[in-house]
């Protein structure tokens, strides 16, 4: 017989009494009746009918008391999650984006004005937009280029952002219609009486050059631009008129002084002054004028250089050495001026004459504080008080073999070793209040830091001096630029520079055939030419390819030299076989004109006398 187990339905189903009494609810977990008051019942019914969620904490606590500990924890967590979800979430802004996303967004902008405006927004935008702003540079003024070279020497980290520089568009300071205006003024000078004032107004339109930046702080040169003088006539009529005007001016002054003694006018003046003080005039601040700095005018003592657009050789050498990641260098149609390099042993004597003093001393510290992510305080970075961090980092990087530098490094590692030492006081963190009480640093420290500033070289164009002792100077030639390009961008890994892709040396009058051969020989590795072979019958424009591997480099030598249409002054594209053959012929001095090349082909085609007959 199959025995059936008895099932207790009361343990699973609610009692019948709970269905009849609306003031009670049955809990299926504890199998007990939960009494509910009328006030709580009305709240539950209103919630079930679609009303607002107005349940109180008392109803929830009645049900929670009947549950186990685990259920209590889960219910508490659910309440916390619900409260946080209902809270207002902060909106996600641009600053919360990762740096990679911001760099991609700024890369799509491609606008110089937009990058300049972004640098004024916040510190994060400044750090992201600065590399894009300095990536592609082109100059039209020698004054602005001189300022930029000095800024590179003050802050060499900017040179890592530069990839393209264009100096082919540099112009002189005179306006385009300056010559026509001078001719018209010369013609009308004899007939009109305002000739001198017109000429001075036209002179004031001439823009400043790099020499104005060089002699900016030189006391021998006036800082003021050309003065607007007035013409003086020696006629008797004008003198009588001037005497009458002076007498009338004296009478007006006396009348004004007497008017102050009248009480009525005094009250009016006082009331008008009080009104002006109570209600000052409204002024609007235009942030757009912050960077609209007009170009300075030429100095009156440098008018002889108004039509020149030359640049010193030292500036170009600074540009090449301080920009290691440059890809495109355009020096086409650029005129160079002579320059001199100051000897290393006498460089420290001219520290006070350097053009880096044209900028404020806190410029480098401010820029480093903005670009540094791990700076301790904004006060130190903005005002340049972090002397331990900014001023002496070059000593540890450059590994100077000097006893004084070793003492500096030892004192930096143990700043509290000797309290009486000058170095321990100098390397301690200064206080703004007692900054003037600190002892001055010894001159050897300033000399070492100055000699290692930038690329470690100082030229005569970097000083606000016109001349000095010839024993301290070594003259620079134009070939130093070619040697600097080949030295900075050639590497042992490959035959060419890893980054340099375009060099424009077109319309260079000083460039000769021998200098071009040396420059191309330094850039191109000779190992490439040993296994290659060019026959005499093969021309530059022939279709047969050689074993030379093409490189991504273009060198423009067109219209260079003292004559036009020279055989070696051509565009050399090493991506093509024609350019690779041409560069080999230039190095081997085997470039011929069209007539000589035709005669060579004819001689090879006909052969020697009797050779074809015997064959």
From Swiss-Prot:
Residues 264-278 have a biased composition (Basic residues). Residues 91-137 form the F-box domain. It comes from the Eukaryota. PROSITE patterns: FBOX. InterPro entries: F-box-like_dom_sf (IPR036047), F-box_dom (IPR001810). The keyword Magnesium does not apply. Residues 172-198, 264-291 are annotated as: Disordered. The keyword Ribonucleoprotein does not apply. Keywords: Ubl conjugation pathway. SUPFAM superfamilies: F-box domain. Pfam families: F-box-like. F-box protein probably involved in ubiquitin conjugation pathway. This is F-box protein COS111. The gene is COS111.
């Amino acid at each position: 017989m199959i025995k059936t187990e008895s099932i207790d339905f009361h343990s699973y189903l609610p009692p019948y009494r709970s269905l009849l009494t609306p003031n009670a609810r049955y809990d299926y977990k504890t199998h007990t009746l939960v009494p509910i008051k009328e006030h709580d019942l009305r709240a539950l019914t209103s919630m079930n009918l679609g009303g607002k969620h107005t349940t109180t904490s008392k109803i929830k606590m009645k049900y929670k008391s009947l549950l186990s500990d685990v259920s209590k924890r889960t219910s508490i967590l659910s309440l916390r999650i619900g409260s946080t979800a209902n809270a207002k979430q902060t909106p996600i802004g641009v600053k919360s984006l990762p740096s990679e996303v911001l760099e991609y967004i700024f890369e799509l902008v491609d606008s110089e004005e937009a990058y300049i405006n972004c640098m004024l927004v916040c510190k994060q935008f400044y750090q992201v937009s600065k590399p894009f702003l300095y990536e592609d540079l082109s100059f039209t003024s020698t004054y602005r280029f001189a300022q930029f070279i000095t800024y590179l020497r003050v802050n060499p980290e900017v040179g890592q952002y530069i990839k393209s520089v264009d100096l082919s568009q540099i112009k002189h300071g005179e306006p385009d219609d300056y010559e026509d205006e001078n001719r018209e003024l010369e013609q009308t000078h004899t007939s009109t009486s305002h000739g001198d004032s017109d000429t001075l107004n036209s002179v004031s339109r001439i823009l400043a050059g790099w020499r104005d930046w060089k002699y900016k702080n030189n006391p021998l040169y006036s800082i003021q631009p050309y003065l607007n003088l007035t013409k003086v006539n020696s006629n008797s009529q004008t003198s009588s008129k001037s005497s009458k005007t002076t007498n009338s001016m004296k009478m007006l002054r006396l009348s004004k002084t007497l008017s102050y003694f009248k009480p009525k006018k005094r009250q009016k003046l006082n009331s008008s002054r009080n009104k002006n003080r109570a209600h000052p005039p409204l002024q609007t601040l235009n942030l757009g004028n912050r960077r609209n700095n007009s170009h300075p005018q030429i100095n009156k003592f440098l008018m002889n250089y108004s039509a020149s657009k030359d640049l010193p050789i030292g500036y170009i050498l600074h540009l090449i050495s301080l920009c290691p990641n440059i890809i495109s260098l355009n020096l086409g149609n650029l005129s160079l001026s002579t320059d001199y390099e100051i000897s290393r042993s006498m460089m420290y004597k001219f520290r006070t004459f350097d053009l880096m003093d044209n900028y404020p001393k806190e410029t480098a510290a401010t820029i480093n504080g903005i670009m540094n992510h791990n700076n301790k305080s904004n006060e130190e970075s903005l005002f340049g008080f972090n002397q331990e961090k900014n001023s002496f980092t070059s000593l540890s990087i450059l590994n100077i073999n000097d006893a004084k530098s070793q003492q500096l490094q030892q004192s930096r590692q143990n700043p509290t070793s000797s309290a009486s030492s000058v170095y321990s006081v100098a390397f301690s963190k200064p206080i703004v209040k007692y900054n003037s009480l600190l002892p001055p640093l010894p001159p050897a420290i300033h000399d070492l830091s100055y000699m290692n500033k930038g690329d470690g070289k100082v030229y005569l164009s970097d000083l606000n001096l016109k001349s000095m002792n010839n024993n301290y100077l070594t003259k620079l030639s134009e070939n130093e630029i070619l040697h600097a390009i080949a030295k900075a961008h050639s590497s042992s890994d490959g035959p060419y520079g890893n980054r340099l892709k375009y060099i424009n040396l077109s319309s260079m009058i000083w460039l000769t055939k021998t200098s071009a051969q040396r420059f191309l020989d330094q850039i191109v590795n000779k190992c490439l030419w040993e296994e290659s072979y060019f026959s005499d019958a093969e021309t530059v424009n022939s279709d047969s390819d050689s074993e030379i591997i093409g490189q991504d480099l273009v060198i423009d030598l067109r219209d260079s030299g003292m004559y036009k249409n020279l055989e070696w002054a051509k565009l050399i594209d090493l991506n093509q076989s024609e350019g690779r053959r041409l560069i080999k012929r230039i190095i081997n001095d085997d470039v011929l004109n069209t007539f000589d090349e035709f005669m060579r082909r004819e001689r090879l085609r006909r052969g020697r006398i009797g050779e074809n007959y015997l064959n």
